[in-house]
């Protein structure tokens, strides 16, 4: 079903990750600040809120390389909500340590220490919680089977100073061995903390999602195609990935050389053993999609071309020069996901940027998925450029000024040469404010949905 069946009229959205929401001790949270943000969107007639993956980040702060493709980032846990519901005491708030609010950058150590302190407080108060709450928690854990593996994985990582799982002692590398089962029992409290944090995050986000629905705001999430090698997903499901039991890569992901890189891009994530996914009826993938649609209304699928075919590189390669294109069973997978969702349509935005081959375009069109158009890519002087506003045909597109991968519009504009700036000004009557000019151009295209990153909208909201 095309985008205009999901979006009945020309609509506007803003791209902003929850970390940017004001009010939290270290970053934005799933609390009052998120609801206030939704109120602002509703007030200004903006109907879509898009964000990056809500998953935990890696050590560099990237949610695209997460230790779990199912879990939520503990940094988003809202303390005031926990106090209001009686899970921790208001007096505990004074002992949670420093905040990040007086810094000009995000301090991961402060965020992680805060999470640990909140986790200990939740554990201390858990025994005094009502039986009804404990029953609800246990039901949630049973419904979300991924949380057992995730909680265990994170506790083991912390035990070994955050080393990747392939550097752990041998008895910890393999899930479900006798030694590990015994160790898990000894670490039951630490594992319970991780589960409690995920449960509270899920409850808080569910409240945010319902609040957004009451204001007619739809949430657009983000799903990376690949998952991190150092993740609970890979550790607990090794047979689904091109990886040896000891953690060495059999094959890894990337893209071949192009105009921008003579050696290609080597991403280092394991590729999928699609034959195993087929034999298991795509169970892991279907659960992954199911989890995402618990959290969001629409999903941007990153590296959509991977569902048609992917560049496979040997696990020990140092560049992506030598590799092979391998077909993916994307059509079969998407049909199963579509059926799981009721069989009507797939609320997915296909990230189809870069060099897109006919098989990728065919897959997108077969499922009537909207693609993406980035205006910052449009103005290279080529009249056939597919990102030029006049070349955006039909309504089944989502137009962006830029995404998280782009520079801000101001930076993009300042880095254009004089001739490019002059040409754009002459043709598009650019004002002195390039950000607002690009927003106006985006709103004027045929596409049913236009989305701008937050920094372009700050002055107007």
Predicted regions and their residues:
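Conserved, well-ordered alpha-helix/loop/beta-strand core segments that scaffold catalytic motifs
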Residues: 194-227
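Alpha-amylase-like alpha-glycosidases and glucanotransferases acting on alpha-linked glucans and related
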Residues: 3-10, 15-17, 23, 60-199, ...
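Outer-envelope exported proteins of Gram-negative bacteria
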Residues: 52, 218-220, 224, 298, ...
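Catalytic domains of carbohydrate-active enzymes, especially glycoside hydrolases
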Residues: 33-55
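Active-site-adjacent substrate/metal-binding segments within catalytic domains
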Residues: 14-18, 25-29, 51
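Conserved small/polar residues in nucleotide/adenosyl-binding loops
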Residues: 459-461
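Surface-exposed amphipathic alpha-helices with a cationic face
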Residues: 42, 205-213, 338-342, 364-365
């Amino acid at each position: 079903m095309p985008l205009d069946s999901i979006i009945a009229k020309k609509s506007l959205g803003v791209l902003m990750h929850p970390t940017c929401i004001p009010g939290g001790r270290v970053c934005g949270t799933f609390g009052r600040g998120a609801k206030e943000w939704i109120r602002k969107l509703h007030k200004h007639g903006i109907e879509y809120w898009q964000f990056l993956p809500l998953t935990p980040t890696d050590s560099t702060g990237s949610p695209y390389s997460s230790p779990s493709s199912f879990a939520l980032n503990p940094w988003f846990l809202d303390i005031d909500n926990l106090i209001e519901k009686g899970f921790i005491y208001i007096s505990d708030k004074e002992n949670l340590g420093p905040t990040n609010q007086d810094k000009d950058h995000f301090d991961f150590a402060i965020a992680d220490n805060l999470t640990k302190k909140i986790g200990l407080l939740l554990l201390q108060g858990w025994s005094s919680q009502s039986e009804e709450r404990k029953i609800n928690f246990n039901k949630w854990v049973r419904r979300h089977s991924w949380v057992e593996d995730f909680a265990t994985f994170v506790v083991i990582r912390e035990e070994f100073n955050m080393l990747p799982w392939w550097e752990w002692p041998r008895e910890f590398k393999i899930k479900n061995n006798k030694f590990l089962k015994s160790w898990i029992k000894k670490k039951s409290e630490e594992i319970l903390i991780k589960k409690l944090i995920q449960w509270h995050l899920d409850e808080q986000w569910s409240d945010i999602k319902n609040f957004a629905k009451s204001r007619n705001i739809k949430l657009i999430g983000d799903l990376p195609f690949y998952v991190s090698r150092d993740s609970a997903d890979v550790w607990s499901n090794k047979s689904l990935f091109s990886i040896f039991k000891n953690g060495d890569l059999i094959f890894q992901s990337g893209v071949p050389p192009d105009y921008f890189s003579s050696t290609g891009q080597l991403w280092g994530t394991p590729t999928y053993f699609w034959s195993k996914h087929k034999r298991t009826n795509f169970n892991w993938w279907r659960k992954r999609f199911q989890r995402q649609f618990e959290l969001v209304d629409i999903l941007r699928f990153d590296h959509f071309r991977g569902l048609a075919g992917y560049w496979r590189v040997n696990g020990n390669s140092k560049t992506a020069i030598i590799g092979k294109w391998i077909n993916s069973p994307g059509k079969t997978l998407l049909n199963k996901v579509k059926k799981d969702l009721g069989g009507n349509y797939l609320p997915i935005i296909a990230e189809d940027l870069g060099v897109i081959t006919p098989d990728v375009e065919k897959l997108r069109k077969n499922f009537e998925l909207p693609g993406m158009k980035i205006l910052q890519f449009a103005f290279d002087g080529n009249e056939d450029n597919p990102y030029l506003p006049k070349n955006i045909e039909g309504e089944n597109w989502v137009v962006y000024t830029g995404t998280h991968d782009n520079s801000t519009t101001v930076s993009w504009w300042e880095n254009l040469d004089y001739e490019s700036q002059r040409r754009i000004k002459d043709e598009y009557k650019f004002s002195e404010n390039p950000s607002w000019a690009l927003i106006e151009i985006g709103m004027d295209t045929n596409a049913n949905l236009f989305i701008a990153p937050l920094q372009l909208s700050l002055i107007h909201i």
